[in-house]
Amino acid sequence: MVHHNTQVRLNPADETIQVGVTQIRFLVTGAESNGSAAILELTIPAGARFPALPHSHEAYEETLYGLEGISTWTVDGVSIELGPGQALCIPRGAVHGFANHGAVDAKTLTTVSPAEIGPEFFREMAAVIDAAAGGPPDRSKMVEIMRRYGLTSAPPPSV
């Protein structure tokens, strides 16, 4: 039986989490969507890359829609530039990461379906990154957090 959430409101989650320099604003989480989707707004500052490790996940897809600026997504080794009005679906199992190589901030609307990941993951990752105080974050702690939330860290690139 599907539980119907009777508290219908705009941006029911409305929580912003800072992970390094990247800002993640949750608009809807699995708690508000009965697990069907999480929707978040991702803001990547100019010249920045997301501090989490490239990864994959088998439990959900990520669908991205460009709102502002251009973000660069590397999906299974292929670099894809996502701009305003463009959509990109990252399938389950695809190794991916992202950056903003541009001169202006980039913003995407991201849907995770089903909602297998939420604010808790990003809060924990932010704590590890903040603890590094500008230095490299503890990779083993990051990998452990990722594992607990169903993400598989990609091996580091060969030099």
Show which residues each predicted segment covers:
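Structural motif
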Residues: 23, 63, 70-72, 79, ...
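Short, conserved beta-strand element in jelly-roll/cupin
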Residues: 41-45, 56-74, 111-113
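A hydrophobic/aromatic-rich effector-binding and dimerization subdomain
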Residues: 2-5, 111, 115-134
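Short acidic-glycine-tyrosine-enriched beta hairpin
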Residues: 8-10, 17, 77-95
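Basic/polar N-terminal segments that are highly enriched at the extreme N-terminus
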Residues: 1-14, 152, 157-159
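Ligand-binding loop in jelly-roll beta-barrel domains
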Residues: 72, 92-119
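A short glycine-rich, His/Asp/Glu-containing loop-to-beta-strand
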Residues: 15-54, 60-61
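Acidic/histidine-enriched, glycine/proline-rich intrinsically disordered or flexible terminal extensions
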Residues: 123-159
